Amino acid sequence: MLKSTTRPLSEAYQLALLDLDGVVYRGKNPVEHAAESIRKAEGLGMTVEYTTNNSSRLQSVVADQLKGFDLDVEPWQVITSSVVAARMVARAVPQGAKVFVLGAQHLREEVAKQGLEVVDSAEDKPVAAIQGWYPDMSWNQMAQIAYAVEQGATYFVTNRDLTIPRELGIAPGCGSMIMAVINATGVEPVSSAGKPESAMYDEARLLAAHDGAEPVAKEACLAIGDRLDTDIEAGNRGGYDSLAVLTGVTNPHELMFAPEHLRPTYIAKDLTGLNAVSYTHLTL
């Protein structure tokens, strides 16, 4: 449901769950007004975390890119789908269990951080299998995860984005590779860490709580993104208020005619809306 507020959103909410591409940056370039708006919100006491379906980029690498925009960012503030997926698996299997990992080094490291044993063969009899974005994947690696899943390993994935934009055009994304395993085994993943599932926002709330502090209540969190079918839908599924910005893929026409499950709580042309009184209408 669309809302309006008499206070700036950065004062009305304690925790901002910010998408990255199309909101904070486009590729290597910062989105206009984004960094200054984030700094202002943090100056008012808002905590900011950055959420991304990308499962291959290390948190430290993303943090360094954001520091290049003059943002004060620590790696823990970057919540990738690998971080979320590894935590999901760790809660589902015994400590020290064998987990087949098909993904980039970042995913392998996150699984190992959870006290799980990373394996590369179905012959190791893993109790779980996790698949993430891995453009260098071989046929044999894909076959191995299919064997593991077919043998009963619980199947997790980092995200189900079917496509990924590249300089030369649209390429198959993680979801397309996952479909190959589903088609081979007939088994659907039990969980996906990436948006539009709400797990990423739920884990971000937990990770923002330090030194035994209670997590910020959902009602005090604001999900911010440019994509209705990922960022905003994840907020709606999880019960989070959301802010849609028009600096990425969504245009005013799509916002006006979005079905209910894709409608944001607030709308702004860019992240300056984070520090302004927010209204529900768009000026076209």
Where are these regions (language model features)?
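Acidic, Mg2+-coordinating phosphoryl-transfer loop and its flanking beta/alpha structural elements
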Residues: 224-257
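Short acidic low-complexity segments
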Residues: 5-8, 116-127
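Substrate-recognition element of Asp-dependent hydrolases with the DxDx(T/V) motif
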Residues: 17-18, 29, 38-65, 78, ...
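Positively charged, low-complexity intrinsically disordered leader regions
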Residues: 1-15
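Conserved Lys-Pro-Asp/Glu-containing loop-to-beta segment of HAD-superfamily phosphomonoesterases
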Residues: 192-231
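Active-site phosphate-binding/coordination module
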Residues: 44-121
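Conserved small/polar residues in nucleotide/adenosyl-binding loops
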Residues: 280-284
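Asp-based phosphoryl-transfer active-site loop
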Residues: 12-27
